[in-house]
Regions:
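Charged catalytic and DNA/RNA-contacting regions of genome-maintenance
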Residues: 1-289, 295, 301-312, 324-426
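Helix-rich, typically C-terminal accessory recognition domains appended to large enzymatic cores
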Residues: 318-321
């Protein structure tokens, strides 16, 4: 297979069998073994996130589960210090690329990784060769002791393949990124290794033209180094990491998981662009002055599920058709139908807005494709199928989601199921 066995772990010469939780509890460096010829000390456990777990969006946890995978590569020889990074959140179909020159302390790399809070970091095997470990690898493993590390052969950090991936997967709306990154070889190399690896662990491929690809420079944001963020308790309480007494905890009245993620990112990497800040302040001012708009938006937005995570699972095509994959498709269609049915209420709430940003949001909701997708869904899914909370009620919704006469075998199975349920109820 593309990636080798990752179940062994050697620490100080003695073999250990570790579960995910025990591996992450160690203070030793945990490195995933990919196709390496050497028998270097390794420890590896990954968590594929193909399903969409839905919780109430009105109560977003301040400490969400990490779901970001990052690939990091550094130049060699005279290019040492030039770092390329590529990251993807398994709950969000967006690839973020970065390339920058860093100093010998690698403060920029550490800060960017702290902001991303990765589930897993992918690096080249040459960065951690026995007796020849790079300073970057040593610093990252020192700062991220509870993060899984995985190494892949250097040949998979291929900038040509990275550009091909971006051309193939980047949605047409974001195609201007090609011009930004075509000469940035290290972030392209990181993108190639990252996307190949994610496809491997997810056992799926991304649909063509389905990802948002963005090059993230640091020109319009302030950099807060990781030690300052920790000392100021911006997102994590130093006494108790589960305690919400932080700047993030005080400000987090967001109604969706996506909003919570955006707030966290803005706290750790605040904007310095005056125009953008003033545009946002205009929105705040309008919401303060128009009570009906404020509560109307709040009511609609709180009904949304994790839209970014839903999009992420929708654009992944499973390599194998299984019963579980089929069930996931039905579940995701119900979630998508629920989301699309909220477009009109959201438009109605935004209709009377005056600020440019809120008007832009309203105009984006005018896109006719929302209606076309919903119409296609309703040709197969019953109109009265609804997203409901609770496993049992959702199971019932899934059983009767597909309209009759679409598949005769499904109709027979469903009729049998109904008869059995009725018989049980009559006992």
């Amino acid at each position: 297979s593309y990636f080798g066995d990752k179940s062994s772990c050697i620490e100080n010469g003695s073999a250990l069998n570790l579960t995910s939780s025990s591996a992450r509890g160690l203070n030793s460096t945990c490195v995933g073994k990919t196709p390496l010829s050497s028998s270097r000390s390794v420890c590896r456990s990954h968590t594929p996130l193909m399903g969409l777990s839905v919780t109430s969006s009105s109560a977003v946890s301040a400490h969400s589960v990490a779901s970001v995978i990052v690939a990091v590569v550094e130049g060699r020889g005279l290019a040492r210090g030039e770092v390329g990074m590529a990251s993807i959140d398994l709950k969000n179909p967006e690839v973020i690329l970065s390339q920058f020159a860093d100093n010998t302390t690698y403060a920029k790399v550490i800060t960017k990784l702290k902001i991303l809070t990765p589930l897993e970091i992918v690096m080249s095997n040459t960065a951690c060769d026995a007796g020849n470990t790079t300073k970057l690898f040593s610093l990252i493993t020192e700062h991220f002791k509870n993060v899984t590390f995985t190494t892949v052969q250097r040949k998979y950090f291929n900038e040509t393949k990275g550009l091909e991936y971006i051309e193939q997967l980047c949605a047409s709306e974001f195609s201007t990124v090609f011009m930004e990154v075509q000469s940035k070889y290290y972030c392209l190399a990181a993108a190639a290794a990252l996307l190949k690896y994610v496809e491997f662990i997810q056992n799926s491929v991304y649909a063509p033209k389905s990802l948002k690809v963005r090059f993230q420079g640091s020109e319009k944001t302030a950099m807060i180094d990781s030690s300052s963020a920790q000392n100021l308790e911006l997102v994590i309480n130093n006494r108790d990491s589960r305690n919400g007494h932080t700047l993030f905890g005080v400000l987090n009245y967001t109604k969706t998981p996506g909003g919570s993620r955006r707030l966290r990112s803005n706290i750790l990497e605040p904007l310095v662009d005056a125009e953008t800040i003033n545009t946002r302040l205009d929105c705040v001012q309008e919401l303060l002055q128009d009570e009906e708009l404020f509560f109307g938006l709040q009511a609609v937005i709180s009904k949304f599920l994790d839209t970014e995570q839903l999009l992420s699972v929708l654009v992944q095509i499973p390599k194998q058709d299984t019963v579980k994959a089929a069930e996931s498709k039905i579940t995701n269609l119900i979630y998508l139908k629920h989301t699309l049915e909220l477009v009109e209420p959201l438009k109605a709430a935004l209709r009377s807005c005056n600020t440019s940003l809120l008007k832009a949001y309203y105009n984006s909701l005018e896109d006719t494709r929302f209606g076309i997708i919903l119409e296609k869904i309703t040709t197969v899914i019953n109109d009265d199928t609804r997203y409901t909370k609770g496993c049992l009620s959702m199971r019932t919704q899934k059983c009767y989601a597909v309209k009759p006469n679409i598949n005769e075998f499904l109709d027979i199975a469903r009729r049998t199921y109904t008869e059995i349920v009725d018989d049980i109820a009559g006992i």
